[in-house]
């Protein structure tokens, strides 16, 4: 690349090109470091990145593109991801909403497919921590899990389409506790013994089928 180093250039607005003259970046500098807007281009001349810098560090909104399509938006503070971030699919539909604190995922993230919410997940310090829920495209809850520092912790439940619990598994910091419990669509535990003759007679007297 024929462009001289930033520290040797006094201008604040620059075009960086390769040896063939193709434009790679439009940048702003102050005292030889990136400061202000940056725009990067692919071989077709399309924008692949827009970002803001302060004293050589990303600071403000960054956007990433695939051709003319926006792929991601993310906020930065002093070089670290901070605040909301969004991802988009090839059709421009939102696929994820996340939040960052000091460069780590924090709080609730939401994930989408075909415009529908399919997962919510909670993070602490970049690790799964708290409840994660998965949904079908019809909005029905499919599974609810719980995490502590990226390890399964607590009860994991899977559901039938009618909302009844299909399966229950308990965990303690990633280790399964006890047996996997299965249930039919009426909520009855599979493998559970039927009622004794006396109990069945009492059920019939109460009018229970």
Model regions: which residues?
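Glycine/tyrosine- and acidic-biased, solvent-exposed loop/turn segments at the edges of beta-strands
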Residues: 1-209
